[in-house]
């Protein structure tokens, strides 16, 4: 069996190498990658990947060549189905866990702190993310498989476990059960570690000696694999970091595949790597101008960006408008706000009808809907004063990270908090923290990335030591504004409540730093899979770490929710993020800096960037969230897949190059962006910059387009002001595509 496995992998690898050499440089990379996103037909029980696959992953981490995978036919389907059980009804203390002596009227009390994990049943052949690919999948050429075939299709019939720590627990459970069977100890009273599903009973007296020895040998191999995993775990790292490192390694391979297939694929790969992986870059800081030098002489004694505004003088409880702001279209606005509890609220329409006050209107509506004003004794005039002051500190001239985005994230978080699976799970204070964090999470955003601020030696980067620069600034401004006149909406909270809320808000907003994405995803997936393996299907959420982890991922999902919204909204968000990226690219060009990935308006592929963004970032995140709240997020996943297919269909087809061009493309592959991901935080690779500059200098990309803003003002923004004759001729031979605005990740 071992020889057969090696032969298959060897043949697959050869086929992969031959196909890679034959592909055209400008061929669409994502069509080739589609077979890797396997379709799950059903999910009925938890299942470990075969031991041979797990050993391949382990071997990939080792430098010793003698570590040969040991295949096994050990039956692994011994883990429990996710059962529905009662949630714990005790209260929860943010600092100290459950508290039996808390009054039912205490806003910190939760009616139920347990989250029930539901079994994943059949759902319409949806593709799975790259997280469910085994290491052996990477040896298969994307060109050698049809769209509907997958080597992993048999494996994925059940709920496959992919996080290493959960795999170790499941494997040890297998070892325990087989040990009990081999030693005739099955008659003992069942314990919490006994199998909770229908496992075929094995009796030593009824099986042959050969089968007995085979089962014993394979059980020993499982135990060896567990020991190998645990030996690599360092004491200073958490078990969820095992998953984080694994996911980063898998994403690294995916991006390397993508970068080798086309110039635009290389650009998308570089963007995803630079934005969503926690990597440090050595940069050449340009010499500051005289004006900048004079500006930096001022002491950093105050939080920058805070403006003195007066909204409270004209507000009294008796004259507060119905939705917090004055508007001549109150009835129409009321009609739109009827969808405030639904996914896909038309937030751009809300902005138009409210005089560009969507954040104030939506926050006020949600606070009324959830009765938070009464629960926390918040004066309505104080709430409106704070919200208008906060909204004024979002920059109207920033295309994406503005008050409309903040309102969208607030409303999305509100809907996610209301999902049936999370009913009665979180306390009122936790709900308040999540909504408040969503409202302030991008306040005073300058429209450039953290890396831009670091590269330009900005005052903010100096103040926050290059660590989550913008996220720290958003928090500082959001809390500082509470000190303005009649703005303290938390004035009637107890000291303990206020401290707890502040801690939660800080943890949630810092988690919106996109460079922390893979760590967040790995933590959530490890927690979900571990609970599936070790319990009857209930996440107790009886400690602060678990609860804040769910809230962090919830707001992170809301922040990356644009591709899951109706296509009309998604396209508008795409236009906006690309406009913001291009403005940053223009500033970098003016300064003589290297232009950041996806920020060069002369060389950007909007459609391919969205497909890659969904495949490698959004889909894995929402797939994991949907696992947590199953089946509540299935419609969201369906919309995400539909939107992905739409952008896929709009990718223009490039004509096949001549043989000479093809040969030239092969030679150029050695200059492609190379992803050398170092998993240890202290020694990240920074080789991307040198090789990535090759791509940015080439402005003849045929994927540049005109961005059609579908806002209320319907403006048209030319992305290519000067296009080379070859690119023009190439575009004329293809159908013209209008790329609308939409969602792209927070930078």
Swiss-Prot record:
Regulation: Inhibited by rolipram. Activated by phosphatidic acid.
PROSITE patterns: PDEASE_I_1, PDEASE_I_2
Cofactor: Zn(2+); Mg(2+); Mn(2+)
Domain PDEase, chain residue ranges per copy: 325-654
Cofactor notes: Binds 2 divalent metal cations per subunit. Site 1 may preferentially bind zinc ions. Binds 2 divalent metal cations per subunit. Site 2 has a preference for magnesium and/or manganese ions.
Reaction(s) catalysed by this chain's protein: 3',5'-cyclic AMP + H2O = AMP + H(+)
Biological or metabolic pathway of the protein: Purine metabolism; 3',5'-cyclic AMP degradation; AMP from 3',5'-cyclic AMP: step 1/1
InterPro entries noted in UniProt: PDE4_UCR, PDEase, PDEase_catalytic_dom, PDEase_catalytic_dom_sf, PDEase_CS
Primary localization class, coarse: cytoplasm
Amino acids binding Mg(2+): 442
Binding site for Zn(2+) 2: 442
Induction, per UniProt: Up-regulated by cAMP and follicle-stimulating hormone.
Binding-site residues for Mn(2+), renumbered to this chain: 442
Keywords per UniProt: cAMP, Cell membrane, Cytoplasm, Cytoskeleton, Hydrolase, Isopeptide bond, Magnesium, Manganese, Membrane, Metal-binding, Phosphoprotein, Ubl conjugation, Zinc
Bias kind Polar residues: ranges: 701-712
Binding site for 3',5'-cyclic AMP: 401, 610, 613
Record PTM Phosphoserine, positions in chain: 238, 240, 287, 314
Post-translational modification (record): Sumoylation of long isoforms by PIAS4 augments their activation by PKA phosphorylation and represses their inhibition by ERK phosphorylation.
Subunit structure: Homodimer for the long isoforms. Isoforms with truncated N-termini are monomeric. Binds ARRB2. Interacts with PDE4DIP. Identified in a complex composed of RYR1, PDE4D, PKA, FKBP1A and protein phosphatase 1 (PP1). Interacts (via N-terminal region) with SHANK2 (via proline-rich region); the interaction is increased in a PKA-dependent manner.
Role played: Hydrolyzes the second messenger cAMP, which is a key regulator of many important physiological processes.
PANTHER family cross-referenced by the UniProt entry: CYCLIC NUCLEOTIDE PHOSPHODIESTERASE
Protein name per the record: 3',5'-cyclic-AMP phosphodiesterase 4D
Organism: Mus musculus
Primary gene name: Pde4d
